[in-house]
Curated annotation (Swiss-Prot):
UniProt xrefs under InterPro entries: PCD_sf, Pterin_deHydtase
Protein name: Putative pterin-4-alpha-carbinolamine dehydratase
Domain of life: Bacteria
Enzyme Commission designation: 4.2.1.96
Keyword Lyase annotated: yes
Keyword entries, A-Z: Lyase
Annotated Gene3D superfamilies: Transcriptional coactivator/pterin dehydratase (3.30.1360.20)
The reaction(s) this protein catalyses: (4aS,6R)-4a-hydroxy-L-erythro-5,6,7,8-tetrahydrobiopterin = (6R)-L-erythro-6,7-dihydrobiopterin + H2O
Source organism (scientific name): Prochlorococcus marinus (strain MIT 9312)
Pfam families found in the cross-reference section: Pterin_4a
GO BP annotations, alphabetical order: tetrahydrobiopterin biosynthetic process
HAMAP family named in the record: Pterin_4_alpha (MF_00434)
Length: 96
C-alpha cells in the first residue's frame, strides 16, 4: 500500500467511519481501556502483529489497563491512508 496524505474532508470522514479515534496534532489517537494489565498487554501483542504486516508502527503508551495509540506517517508528515487502515484494523482487534 502506497501511503498518501489524507485531505481535510477525508480526515472528517475518518473520525466518523472509525469510532473512537480523534485527530490530535497531525496524528490520530485513541485510548483503549481493559479490565487489567494482562488484557491490555494481550491487545498490544495482537496490534503489534498487524503493525508488522503493514510495516507501520504506532506511538503508544501503556499504563496498567489503559493503552493509548497514536498514528501518523512520519515520512509524509501527517495522517495517511495507511494510518486510517491501521486504525480500522486496531478497532477490529479491540471489538473481538
Amino acid at each position: 500500500m502506497e501511503p498518501y496524505l489524507l485531505r481535510d474532508e477525508e480526515l472528517k470522514e475518518l473520525v466518523v467511519k472509525i469510532p473512537g479515534w480523534e485527530i490530535k496534532s497531525e496524528q490520530i489517537q485513541r485510548e483503549f481501556s481493559f479490565a487489567n494489565f494482562i488484557e491490555a498487554f494481550s491487545f498490544m501483542t495482537k496490534v503489534a502483529l498487524i503493525c508488522e504486516k503493514y510495516n507501520h508502527h504506532p506511538n503508544w503508551e501503556n499504563i496498567y489497563s489503559k493503552v493509548i495509540i497514536s498514528l501518523n506517517t512520519h515520512d509524509l508528515g501527517g495522517i495517511t491512508n495507511l494510518d486510517q487502515t491501521l486504525a480500522s484494523e486496531i478497532n477490529k482487534i479491540f471489538d473481538q
